[in-house]
Swiss-Prot record:
GO terms for molecular function: G protein-coupled receptor activity; identical protein binding. It is found in: Cell membrane. This is G-protein coupled receptor 151 protein. InterPro entries: GPCR_Rhodpsn, GPCR_Rhodpsn_7TM. One of its GO terms (biological process) is response to acidic pH. It comes from Mus musculus (Mouse). The keyword Cell membrane applies. The chain crosses the membrane at residues 46-66, 77-97, 124-144, 158-178, 206-226, 260-280, 291-311. Residues 339-422 are annotated as: Disordered. High expression in the brain and lower levels in kidney and liver. In the nervous system expressed specifically in the habenular area (at protein level). The keyword Cytoplasm does not apply. CDD domains: 7tmA_GPR151 (cd15002).
Amino acid sequence: MGKAMLRAGFADTNSSNMNESFARLHFAGGYLPSDSKDWRTIIPSLLMAVCLVGLVGNLCVIGILLHGVWKRKPSTIHSLILNLSLADFSLLLFSAPVRAAAYSKGVWDLGWFICKSSDWFTHVCMAAKSLTFVVVAKACFAYASDPAKQESIHSRTIWSVLAGIWVVASLLPLPEWLFSTTRRHAGVEMCLVDVPAVAEEFMSMFGKLYPLLVFCLPLLLAGVYFWRAYDQCKTRCTKTRNLRDQMRSKQLTVMLLSTAIISALLWLPEWIAWLWVWHVKAGGPMPPQGFIALSQVLMFFTSTANPLIFLVMSEEFKAGLKGLWKWMITRKPAVTSEVQEAPAGNTEALPGKAPSPETQTCILDTDGRGSPDDSKEKSGKVVAPILPDVEQFWHERDAVPSAQDNDPIPWEHEGQETEGCN
């Protein structure tokens, strides 16, 4: 998540001078020097397991939402959920592997660009998620108040809101991009935050305001809007006849509220560690390395928990997953045998096509001219023939209309026809 620690020292007690020099360093990019081989194995393994499960879950959610966009006009809430899933997918695809690689090595060998952009990119995705929670909570409240109103929002408005979220999220952690760099210290290549003296006051203010702007205020506003939306759903469900939309609104509100609460709880240890290392006093205790490492694992686990919540709590996502699976199966290439003609001697039509009455008659005539053995074999499949006199009767009736058909008062002649027959 940002800095692994602000003032950290190696566990090696044999070199006190080295510890004193390391205590003044600001590590960045997930780089956390440690002499423990267990931590270098456990933390990367946990990160990769979380990464694999989360990538599969987010791919399912993204596929369901994109399949829905392809079939119909995207809704505001679905577009915002898609934005959440894209942020989670980006975190797991780009940031988690970098953290795993940084933890597994005692030196930084991932290059200058990754060192400079790692913390910035991680915070961009987290800020985008926090801002998206605020917007989706506001959309849930609007949908609970008037479900029909949400359908009238133009697609350009939705994409403009999403673009604005990512622009703001990119600007908030920009100081981390400016001051993160690689340095060689005590013969070891490290990823550090090198703050010049003229910018120390600015970075001190940044350390106080950034968690407030990215974590506290957005989730507080989102919680208020979610609670109002939930209360609105309970009120309107007792007064409206359109219970289907209200039940859907309540389900979406509960699902997204659960996602916001889980995200806040899993982010909390990381922000505690972040504030601890930024505001520790000179000579004060530093957070344990294990706490810092596990807090970052929990932060990435948030991106795995979100798609699981969507797929478990939403009936709409369950149905969408089934529909997406059926769509993927039915899009297989057509079998070439379906377009080929039926072979000779097997004239019982292609699969799925019923033969016409004329075809049935032709088959019957052909069978009649065949050998007796063939007739015996096909006796169970022969259709009853049309009698010649019946066929001639209907043919003459269709070809030559009778006078009775043109008689405007046929009931006057019914008695005469009966007498003539007698």
